[in-house]
Amino acid sequence: MNIFRFLGDISHLSAILILLLKIWKSRSCAGISGKSQLLFAIVFTTRYLDLFTNFISLYNTSMKMVYVASSYATIWMIYSKFKATYDGNHDTFRVEFLIVPTAILAFLVNHDFTPLEILWTFSIYLESVAILPQLFMVSKTGEAETITSHYLFALGIYRALYLFNWIWRYQFEGFFDLIAIVAGLVQTVLYCDFFYLYITKVLKGKKLSLPA
């Protein structure tokens, strides 16, 4: 494993921890898109169906379990434990517009036409756009709490680092996965506007807001 993947995983874990602690400590999921979290749960569930059949390393298996467990823990807190604080009125993105196209694309463009491979490919495509409901929600409300901004920034850094991971693997291992690279580029581009606002506002102590 190279340093970019490791740092990407650390950034991803940091984002998850920030989100879970934010909800649990504040006893509120205000400002968090339940729809984005549902999409992430679908992503990790479909990607890691090989959890108990394909062992690569203890690290790999542990990370898979953490991602799956944390995604469902987040959903439980949003839709059950702290349901009264969930801002469903602003979380209105039509997720079917993300799920259906990515599912169709996974059937058409994949590495191998087998159930597990199609589901893995679907998870890659869906993850690239899963943050859209959250960004849409921030845009609709006009602002985001600082802690939510930190969560989004950590997620964006995770994806950017994974792009460097693919470059490193191509350079030193000769490994090239066009599907993962293109999806990663799409996801990183979606964060670009947010990155700019985060650096120019949040890091200067101001509240982040996206143009409506």
From Swiss-Prot:
Annotated region (Important for recycling of cargo proteins with the sequence motif K-D-E-L from the Golgi to the endoplasmic reticulum), positions in chain: 204-207
Subcellular location(s) per record: Golgi apparatus membrane; Cytoplasmic vesicle, COPI-coated vesicle membrane; Endoplasmic reticulum membrane; Endoplasmic reticulum-Golgi intermediate compartment membrane
Keyword Hydrolase: no
Pfam families: ER_lumen_recept
Any single GO CC term annotated in Swiss-Prot or TrEMBL for this entry: COPI-coated vesicle membrane
Cystines in this chain: none
Statement: the UniProt record of this protein carries the keyword Iron: no
Molecular function as annotated in GO: KDEL sequence binding
Lumenal side, ranges: 1-4, 53-58, 111-116, 169-178
Site feature Important for recycling of cargo proteins with the sequence motif K-D-E-L from the Golgi to the endoplasmic reticulum, where: D193
Annotated PANTHER family: ER LUMEN PROTEIN RETAINING RECEPTOR
Biological role: Receptor for the C-terminal sequence motif K-D-E-L that is present on endoplasmic reticulum resident proteins and that mediates their recycling from the Golgi back to the endoplasmic reticulum.
UniProt-recorded name of the protein: ER lumen protein-retaining receptor 1
Lineage: Eukaryota, Metazoa, Chordata, Craniata, Vertebrata
The encoding gene: kdelr1
